[in-house]
Amino acid sequence: MNIPNKELIQATIFSNCLCNSPYYDLNKLQTDRLNNLVENSRKLSPFYKKKFSYLPDRNVRLEEIPVSTKTELMEHFNSWITNRSLNLSEIKKYLSNTSNIGKPIFDKYLLMESSGSSGTPGIFLHDLKAVEIYHALEASRRANSSLLNQFYWHLYCREKIAYIGALNAHYAGITSICYSKTCYPQLKSTIKELSIYNSKKKLAHSLNIYQPSVVASYPSVAITLAEDQIQGILKLNLREVWVGGESLDQYQKKFIQSAFNAKVFNSYGSSEFPPIAWECDLGRLHVNADWIILEAVDEK
């Protein structure tokens, strides 16, 4: 299950060279990839073949593509997925075993499920070539000043990272960590997972014993930890705090930074596509727009 480092390096070099090239045309790249996606979806997914039947054969524009909700996709799961040998019942059986978290089903697809915050939980399959791209983006496009910029390199092994999240299901965060540890064994001694459902006392005790240099979690958790640090419940000497999965305003960010005297870096992702956007050194979120197009679908 190891992905050769040379493949990561090649994908990373391509990612960087593409963005820095004077011939880089983002609009054209988006259009080409969007049309390839529509073409393959029509070809391999009965659900999309029917839904996209009225679209033109080529030069499809984003605004022409009908919205598909998670409820709709899950109701038509077996005709939605592009691998006809898979079905929802066997995927749910695989997901029900928490020991499978981070282990690709049939050694081909990494499974991620959403929490259902929008009303319906979703299940998403990521082929391992796509995951390679995620790793390349992680390795090449994080803020230059952040330790995140070293995520898959050996230099990173000197850090101690505490990931605080939901560990009891195939959510994007814990799934990505477990799979990354398989691909890059050096991360096994670098990252410690702690359950968000632990009591406040137990979590504080675990963190004080572990003494991480980095904490990664949701903004709401980071704020609670910052309060504990100020009150002396926590005694941590952090270098950075990484947050994502919830909104983070500037006041919250400054509070966390002040409490820990550490840099705070925000990110935005989803189970559908984990590496959507990351924060730069100037505090702005930048979308990986060569791989994803963000669109407002309604007034909410």
Predicted feature locations:
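Conserved AMP-binding loop of ANL adenylate-forming enzymes
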Residues: S145-T182, E193
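Short glycine/proline-enriched loop/turn "hinge" motifs that connect secondary-structure elements
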Residues: K103-I105, Y179, Y184
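Short, well-ordered, mixed-charge alpha-helical segments that flank or form enzyme active sites
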Residues: G122, V131-Y134, A169-G173, T224-L225, ...
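Glycine-centered flexibility sites
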Residues: G116-G119, G165, G244, G269
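Nucleotide 5′-phosphate-binding alpha/beta core
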Residues: M1-E113, T120-F151, L155-R158, I209-A216, ...
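Glycine-rich, histidine-containing beta strand-loop boundary motifs that form or position
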Residues: L125-L128, G165, P219, Y268-G269
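Active-site glycine/GP-rich loop and adjacent strand/helix microenvironment
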Residues: M1-E39, P46, C183-K300
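Short glycine- and Lys/Arg-enriched binding-loop motifs that mark or flank ligand-binding interfaces
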Residues: M112-S115, F265
